[in-house]
Every structure is written in structure tokens, then in C-alpha cells.
Amino acid sequence: MNDCRAAVVTALNQPLEILRVPIPELEPGAVLVKIVASTLCGTDVHRWHGPLSPKDSLPFITGHEPCGVIEAINGRRTDILGQPVGPGDRIVWSYVACGSCYYCSVALQPCICPGRASWGHNPSDKYPYLLGSVAEYMYVPPECLLIRVPDEVSSASAAAAACAYRTVMHGFDRLGKIVPNETVVILGSGPLGNFATAVAKDRGAKRVLTIGAPANRLAVAKRMGADAVLDLDAVSDLEDRVAWVREYTAGRGADVVIQVANNAATPEGLAMLRPGGRFVHIGSGGKAEIPVDKLPEQLTFYTVRSGEPRHWLQALEFLSSRKDVFPFEEMISASYPLERVNEALAAMASYEVVKPVITFAT
């Protein structure tokens, strides 16, 4: 086996091509994984449309949310809990971090390591070629930590845990405890927002209010634990949306706001937050001006980038232990074979689906 099929971006904003890409020799400690499922993320859509960041170049294999089965390992490896892994084990894995810089070794924040590297934007015409997840196989560098997937968790949900869900867990990790009388507002009803809705409800929020669009995503949010939802398409005025939140909070505003939409939603979220409240900023993209007049109100503002390795474990544990409480599979709302990747990306871009998954024969 010298090569495999992959979905390759060869030109921005043009249909991806299904091309054969070399399967590389494994350096010591590297792993070759046969992909079972790769969920798509809004970031994949942004990279497809462009522009690329200065470090990126065409062509590249799209996708950065993989789950797969180990095909081969060059040497011996253990998972993040120290247990041996081998061919046939179903895993997800972390990004690359150097392990020796200040952020990795002293601050213990590898998510901001200057040498951090992730997937879905790496040149597919240069070794090690297979660094995108919408492919039959993927190369896992030796620096990556391996996380075994519990039997109770589907491959599609595990793939989503490899980016979207672990980022949400990072946000809740930074937020800390939710007090039972608190009202939590979730800004965004995509995969991150609906997962955050479930986590907030599970952690004891008195009331979870989810704001987003379109209606099909909000319907999922209600089944994920939202006590009330507000459709942005139906309520277009910001003041009306702020008033809606205040109606549920005796005029004070929310105790916690978790923004999982984009930067433009942050000023709106701050307007919904009570004095002394806590704000978690996860969603990125776009530009916004932060209203500094809110800062004297003793707010606590957390920003979140990606996740730490423990957050993969936390996301998988939540999926496993709460599978009978929340309908996680509803968030993976459409499945496509590799040949239909362009259809999947278009459905994601137009919000027709909450989160699509590309599946591969096992």
C-alpha cells in the first residue's frame, strides 16, 4: 500500500479533489491511523474559502477532527493514561506541541506553544503528506498524545471531541464551578453551542438560555438541555435580545455568558452579562470592538484557545457517561462518504446541518 485517497484543497473556493496521496514511512514513534470518521468544522469551511494564513499553502488535505483505528506504529507507544496501544485500537490524538518551551514546561499551557501544530492546512505534496483527516489514512507525529476512545462513544462523536467538544471543556475548565442558582447564556447554536448547552445544564445551572440560528439548530439545543432558546432570525434587534435575557434574570442580566459564535457576538454577550458576571470567549473569527465601559463592573473575562490534552479525556468521558441523558448523535446530523465531501462542506457553510461527518469503510 503506497498511497490512499484524500480530499484535497487545490484551489481556494473551488471544489475539493479526491486525489491519491502517498502514505509515508513512519519515523520512530509515529503512528499510521486508518480513519473511521472525520467530522467537519467551521474552520474547514473558512480554510476552503480562504484567505490562507501566511504559514499555509496549497495543496492541503482538509479536516482536523479525526477518529480512527491504529494501522501501524514505528516502535512502542502508550496512551495518555500510560496504557499500551497497538494496531486495532480506536483513538483520537492531540496536536503537536514542543514539550520544552516556557508554555509547555512551566506554564503548562501547551495550547499556546509557539511550535504548536495542528491539522487540515498542511501541504499534502510534502512529507509526511497525510496531515488532514478527510483521508483514508492519517499520519500521527510522535509528539502527539494518543487518547483511547471508550466503547460507548461513537466514532463520529469521538471525532467531534477532537476539536469542538474538547474546546468547550477547556472553556468550562477555565470558568470553574457553576452555582445552582446561576443563569447561563450560550451565544451560538452550532456544535460548540449545543455541546456547551448540555455541559452547562449538567453542571447545575438553574437556567440555560441558548441564542442562535437557524431554527433546526435551536431545536437540537432544546433537546440538549436549553430551558429557552431565541432565534436570531426572528429577533434581529440587539436591544430586544438583551431584554429577553433580562426577563429571565429579574432585570440583572446573566450570571455567565459563554460565547461560541464569533468575535462579533462578544459585545452583545457583554451587554447581556450582569455586573460581577463571568464571560467565556471561545468563538473566534471576524472583528469586534470591546465596550470598555463594561470593564469597571467587576467582570471576569476568560479567553480560550483550543484545549489541553486533559480536555480530550474530559470530552470523551462526558460523551460516555451522559449518553443516556443527552442525544449527542443528533448533533452529527448528516453522514457523507468521501466522494461527497464538497456536498458536506456546502451543507456546513449554509447551516443546513449542525455538523456533518465523513465516514470511511472499516
Language model feature labels by segment:
Residues I186-S189, K201-T266:
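Adenosine-nucleotide cofactor-binding segment
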Residues P24-S38, L52-S105, P150-E152:
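Glycine-rich beta-strand-centered segment in the early N-terminal region that forms part
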Residues T167, L192, N216:
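Hydrophobic/small residue at the entry helix of a nucleotide-binding pocket
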Residues D173-V179, D202, Y248-G251, A271:
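Glycine-rich helix-loop-beta junction characteristic of Rossmann-like nucleotide cofactor-binding loops
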Residues G277-R278:
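Glycine-centered, small-residue-biased loops immediately flanking beta-strands
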Residues L238-A243, G285-S333, N342-E343, E352-V353:
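C-terminal substrate-binding/catalytic core of Rossmann-like NAD(P)-dependent dehydrogenases/reductases
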Residues C98-L187, F326:
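NAD(P)H dinucleotide-binding glycine-rich loop of Rossmann-like/cofactor-binding domains
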Residues M1-N2, V256, V260, P267, ...:
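C-terminal hydrophobic helical "lid"/dimerization subdomain
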